[in-house]
Amino acid sequence: MHQEKKMLAHISEDGTRVQTVADHLQGTAVLCGQFAAAFDAQQQGTWLGLLHDIGKYSTKFQKRLQGGEKVDHSTAGAQVAARYGQIPLAFAIAGHHSGLPDGGGRSDTAQDATMFGRLKKSVEPYTQWTNEIKLPSIPPQPEMMKENRFTQAFYTRMLYSCLVDADYLDTENFMSSPKARGQGQTMDELLKRLNQYTAKWSHPQGTLNQRRSSILSACTTAGQTGRRGLYSLTVPTGGGKT
């Protein structure tokens, strides 16, 4: 019985260890799902991790690991995500090395670096991924995605950030021993410090500082009483946004 060759994602710097594509995808999926759970998108995060590097199943990428020419390995996953209607995921996958692409337009060609262009691009065959990676059920469309374009864009950027971190950390864990990182202060501790710092602004002097104080108060009230979600802040330069 023919046994398929193991497809590799990484080789250690000393050449003594390898990480298969399947192991990397699954490891990244776990981390990305955990990160995205913070904004109720764990399923989407899992999909991102499982699809982001399926282009590494191509023979051309395997040759790249042995010193061959560079090959685009991110477009494949973006195209699969788009076929399932997961456009925010497609953007995140397409840009997880080079940054989020512009959307572009339907007239864009496969030579364009836009999202429309990437979706038309021919990629190296990577069929073995379906034998090793099983996608869970299609993630539901989050309620927040029905609100407005700003929310959709912010949500896409959050997913992108989760994927970039998860991909980097899983690769780092393979390449070297996991690095101990301090957890830092809790959000409650940071909020306490912020409140202590801004307490001196409770009696602002002058019209500008009064306006700044009013803006801060509006933001604080929204955070305490508003429903969970994504908010935008439109304030002119000098208004104290930071």
Predicted feature residues:
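Accessory nucleic-acid engagement/destabilization modules that flank
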Residues: 1-200
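Basic side chains
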Residues: 56, 211-212, 241
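Hydrophobic alpha-helical scaffolding
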Residues: 149, 205, 235-238
